[in-house]
């Protein structure tokens, strides 16, 4: 599985803003330069992040962006769902009587649930504090 560039940019923008003073307003140009994101693309992603409630936009000469929530309240799942409305591995449409299909999709459902739980467990406060161990499950249950 390969993440879209847009999702990676959301991760990088959230990480950058999480490291700033919570009252500091940061311009899109600063974010783009420091995170090596094409400026016009960063503006598009920032708008999606604001629409999802992750950022506040400040207009005008001294305008820019800052987090709308504390970094501890923003998870990797929030970030991914800024771009991907729904995170699913595969639609589960099996024809009646296909035993192998239902077994496969049952396993995929477990993988998907584990993946979503792990995305919800990791927040941007933890990601900006490298000495804090992440609570991620390694096993599929």
Feature map (PLM): residue ranges:
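Key DNA-contact positions within bacterial/archaeal DNA-binding proteins
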Residues: 40
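Glycine-centered, phosphate/nucleic-acid-interacting loop/turn motifs that mediate DNA/RNA or nucleotide
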Residues: 53
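Minor-groove-contacting beta-hairpin "wing" of winged helix-turn-helix DNA-binding domains
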Residues: 61-68
């Amino acid at each position: 599985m390969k993440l879209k560039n847009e999702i990676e940019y959301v991760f990088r923008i959230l990480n950058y803003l999480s490291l700033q003073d919570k009252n500091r307003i940061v311009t899109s140009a600063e974010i783009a330069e420091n995170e090596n994101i094409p400026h016009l693309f960063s503006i598009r992603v920032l708008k999606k992040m604001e629409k999802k409630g992750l950022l506040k936009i400040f207009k005008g000469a001294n305008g820019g962006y800052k987090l709308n929530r504390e970094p501890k309240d923003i998870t990797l799942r929030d970030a991914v769902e800024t771009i991907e409305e729904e995170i699913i591995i595969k639609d589960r449409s099996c024809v009646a009587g296909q035993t192998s299909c239902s077994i496969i999709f049952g396993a995929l459902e477990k993988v998907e649930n584990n993946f979503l739980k792990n995305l919800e467990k990791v927040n941007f406060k933890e990601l900006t504090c490298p000495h804090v161990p992440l609570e991620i499950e390694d096993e599929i249950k």
